[in-house]
Structures are given as structure tokens and as C-alpha cells.
């Protein structure tokens, strides 16, 4: 179970989606801080604590990553491939949250180690319902593995 102080990292380039997801999280009662990375390279820099993300008091390591697939600079599947190639990130919870429902994307995301594949809802009510489901399962019920020795601090 994640504590309400643990950060969620949303990887999303569409500012409208960021706004609506933030609203849905608020309505669902998710208290966790939400950090946003707008492209694939930013999420890699964030997870490595590099560049502007070096200050871990300002940019804490996330308990959960919500990853869009269609991103500028580096696509979501490439980010997922990179995450799973890093020994210290093997247990990081990465959920794909995308507008694609293409079965090839679904299969590839799971093959690369996504823990879930969620299609972004269009309506506000469905977004709030999704946020509640994320809260209940991933933040309240699920016991995530530790990041293990040598994992991020």
C-alpha cells in the first residue's frame, strides 16, 4: 500500500489530459503528490534524478508511473523498454494510460513489463471512475515490491 505522501509520476504531453486527470484524481480523493513529465526523455531524466530532477526533495522517486504511449522525443514503449533494462527499476510500478486500444500496443506493453494497460476515458465521470479504481487497487490494496538493493533512494 502506498502512503499518501508518495509521488505519482504522470507521463503525458497533452496539457488537457493532464488537467482532466488532475481533476479526476482530486475528485477521487487521491492525496498523493502528482508530478508530470511531458515527454519520454523527461521521464527517464526524472527516474534517474538527472538535470532539473536531481533534487529528490522536490522531485521524489515515484511509487507509481502512469505512462502515455504517444509521446514526443521518446515514445512510451521505448521508455518502458528502458525502465525494464535498468536493474534498479525492475519493480517500479508502471501502468500504461493511453488513448490507444490497439491490441499490438497492449501486447507489446505487457511484454515490456507494464503492470496494467488502461485506456483513457473520454468522459469526466469515467475519468473519475478510473481514478477511483487506481486509488483503490494500486494505492490502497496492492502491496508493491521493494525496489531492492541498489534501487533509487
What are these regions (language model features)?
Residues 67-69, 98:
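Active-site residues of response regulator receiver
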Residues 13, 68, 76:
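Conserved phosphate-binding and hydrolysis motifs of nucleotide-dependent enzymes
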Residues 3, 19-23, 77-78, 101-118, ...:
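Alpha4 helix (beta4-alpha4-beta5 surface) of REC/receiver domains from two-component response regulators
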Residues 36, 71-74, 79:
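Residue-level signal for the "D+5" position in two-component response regulator receiver
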Residues 52-55, 77-90:
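Short amphipathic alpha-helix used as the core "switch/output" element in two-component signaling
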Residues 1-9, 15-35, 41-44, 48, ...:
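Non-catalytic signal-transmission and effector/linker regions of two-component phosphorelay proteins
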Amino acid at each position: 500500500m502506498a502512503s499518501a505522501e508518495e509521488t505519482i509520476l504522470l507521463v503525458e504531453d497533452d496539457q488537457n489530459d493532464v488537467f482532466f486527470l488532475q481533476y479526476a484524481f482530486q475528485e477521487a480523493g487521491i492525496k498523493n503528490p502528482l508530478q508530470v513529465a511531458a515527454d519520454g526523455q523527461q521521464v527517464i531524466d526524472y527516474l534517474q534524478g538527472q538535470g532539473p530532477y536531481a533534487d529528490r526533495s522536490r522531485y521524489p522517486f515515484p511509487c507509481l508511473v502512469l505512462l502515455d504511449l504517444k509521446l514526443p522525443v521518446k515514445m512510451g514503449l521505448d521508455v518502458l523498454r528502458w525502465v525494464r533494462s535498468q536493474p534498479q527499476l525492475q519493480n517500479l510500478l508502471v501502468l500504461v494510460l493511453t488513448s490507444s486500444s490497439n491490441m499490438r500496443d497492449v501486447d507489446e506493453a505487457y511484454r515490456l513489463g507494464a503492470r496494467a494497460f488502461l485506456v483513457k476515458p473520454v468522459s469526466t465521470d469515467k475519468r473519475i471512475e478510473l481514478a477511483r479504481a487506481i486509488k483503490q487497487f494500486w494505492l490502497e490494496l496492492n502491496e508493491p515490491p521493494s525496489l531492492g538493493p541498489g534501487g533509487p533512494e
